[in-house]
Structure formats: structure tokens, C-alpha cells
Amino acid sequence: MPLTKIELNNVTVFHELAVEFDPGVNILLGENGVGKTHIMKLLYAACQAKKSEVTFPYKTVMVFRPDDSNLGRLVNRNADSTNGASVRVSSDDASMAMKFSQKTTKYDADVTGKASWEKQLSDLSSVFIPAKEILSNAWNLSNAVRQGNIIFDDTFSR
């Protein structure tokens, strides 16, 4: 696996988090609302930033869609906002980091490590498949929902 670690400080629901990945398949488990999807979205944004025309802050804004497209909206509001927020994604031979604060507008984060990130991950392909899309392809799931055998929120529809 090209990605080896993600470190988050004051980002969305996280005060401080460091996750090291094992080679092969990694599985994120946890209750609803603990940030599993946020981790996957940040990893996806970092992987997409290996393209020279795509920046880490831009792709992060595009996958989270914060109010007014402001990256600063992703700073954890319960944390000490004077420190701002940071994300670092690492691979075997490179890392890329992004720092921003509540005052950061649009995509104006400080990014370090972009050049080495692009060079090392240039042949990487990544895809993000939302859980809803996986569920919608499950055989006979729509019938089970319609009959009330399985209950999903209103975001699930076919």
C-alpha cells in the first residue's frame, strides 16, 4: 500500500489522531459519527493531489463541500482554534502536509511536500466509493427496504 500514515490535528471531528496503515487491505471500523468517512475522504484528496493540476486543499474542499467552499470550516470548532488544523499523509518515501485555520478561505492552506508527493505517487490510482453506492448494488436490497425488513435513512433510495 503506498500510503503508510495519516496524522490529523483539529480537523473535523478529530482533536488529534495518528493512524498507521499496514500493507494490503486496511479496514476502518467504528460507530457512526466517529470520522471513518472523513479519514477516507482526506486520504482520497491526498491521492488525487499527486496530479500537478490538483492541490490538496482544493480536492479536500471538493470532497467535503464545506459552507462557502472555505477550507477553514473544517477546523474542529471544539478545539483550540488558535492552533489551526493540520493534515499529514505519508507514504514510504514522501509525505504531504496541509495547515489551515478558521480564517483560511477557499483553498489557501499552506502545503508542504507536494513536489516529492507527485513524484513518488505519480502512478497511483485511487477511487472513493461511498457506502451508499455499495448498498445500492446489493441484490434485492431495495425490496427489503420497501417491505420494511431493513431500515435506512432517507438518503438511501434507488
Language model: regions and residue ranges:
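Pre-Walker A-like glycine/lysine-rich segment at the N-terminus of P-loop NTPase domains
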Residues: 1-44
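Phosphate-coordinating catalytic segments in nucleotide- and nucleic-acid-processing enzymes
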Residues: 7, 49-158
